[in-house]
């Protein structure tokens, strides 16, 4: 029986202040899109600024999608940052409507069922917290309980957003199908059947640094059988945090890569900071 290979790309957030990193991301991402990939799923938040579009970032995003769709069928979940605001529910008020005219391109702004080989997948765009099951039931009550996997861009109960743990996100019964979701930028698994691969590009200090593309290999169409997950880390600039004692700052050696951003957090007593200032070490 043929397996099914899906490449998942999480939250690229094309912005005017990360264009150089985006160029490197596109180059390396396309190298991973080999001919044996059945479909590519872009997990939402391709752009960043909601209803305010920046031409350079928009053109980069459109060009990227155009290149991906020429390699394999491409499914794009509409994320909250792709919408005008975070309160939209299965809405067409986003920037990707014109892309629906392209072949091999599927814009997911409404709950969808996708059949590939012997496998069945659900796809849901971002919906406000608490409305995920409602969105699934839009098509037919509880059809989604019999899929191999659901792709989403959703906040689930218990996921971590920096120091905050979600108490408003959707609760997802442990007997429900596996969900692979965008929206949360740090890789995590709040429960067995929910997995956040994290954003393919690090967007803020404190987010996990070893995120990447996620290759999902489905070998068994039997419901409840989880796929093999292979992380493909890209060699693109990171946002690195270095913790150092103030007494050791003068001997700190940095070897930053091109476009890498580094935050240095110095720790010490009030007295040690006063002594540091007197030494005028820069």
Swiss-Prot record:
Q: Which InterPro entries match?
A: Calcineurin-like_PHP_ApaH, DNA_Repair-Maintenance_Comp, Metallo-depent_PP-like
Q: Report whether Metal-binding shows up as a keyword of the record.
A: yes
- State its Enzyme Commission number(s): 3.1.-.-
Quote the record's binding site residues for a divalent metal cation 2. Answer: 45, 80
GO molecular function: any one?
Answer: metal ion binding
Q: Does the keyword Hydrolase apply?
A: yes
Which keywords fit this entry according to its UniProt record?
Answer: Hydrolase, Metal-binding
What are the binding positions for a divalent metal cation 1 in this chain? Answer: 45, 203
Q: Which family does it belong to?
A: Belongs to the metallophosphoesterase superfamily. IIV-6 244L family.
Its name, as the record gives it, is Putative phosphoesterase 244L
Which species? Answer: Invertebrate iridescent virus 6
């Amino acid at each position: 029986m043929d397996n099914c290979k899906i490449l998942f790309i999480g939250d690229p957030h094309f912005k005017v202040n990360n264009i150089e990193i985006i160029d490197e991301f596109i180059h390396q991402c396309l190298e991973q899109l080999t001919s044996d990939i059945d479909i590519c799923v872009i997990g939402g938040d391709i752009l960043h600024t909601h209803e305010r579009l920046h031409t350079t970032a928009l053109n980069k995003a459109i060009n990227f999608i155009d290149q991906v769709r020429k390699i394999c069928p491409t499914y794009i979940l509409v994320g909250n940052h792709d919408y005008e605001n975070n309160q939209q529910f299965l809405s067409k008020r986003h920037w990707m409507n014109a892309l629906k005219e392209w072949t091999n391109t599927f814009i997911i702004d409404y709950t969808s069922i996708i059949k590939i080989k012997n496998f069945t997948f659900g796809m849901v765009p971002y919906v406000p917290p608490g409305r995920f099951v409602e969105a699934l039931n839009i098509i037919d009550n509880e059809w989604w309980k019999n899929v191999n996997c659901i792709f989403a861009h959703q906040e689930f109960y218990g996921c971590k957003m920096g120091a905050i743990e979600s108490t408003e996100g959707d609760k997802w019964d442990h007997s429900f199908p596996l969900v692979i979701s965008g929206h949360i930028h740090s890789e995590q698994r709040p429960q067995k059947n929910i997995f956040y691969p994290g954003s393919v590009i690090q967007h803020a200090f404190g987010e996990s640094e070893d995120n990447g593309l996620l290759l999902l290999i489905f070998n068994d169409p039997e419901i409840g059988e989880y796929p093999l997950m292979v992380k493909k880390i890209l060699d693109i600039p990171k946002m690195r945090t270095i913790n150092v004692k103030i007494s050791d700052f003068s001997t700190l050696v940095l070897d930053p890569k091109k476009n890498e951003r580094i935050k240095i957090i110095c720790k010490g007593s009030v007295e040690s900071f006063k002594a540091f200032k007197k030494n005028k070490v820069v």
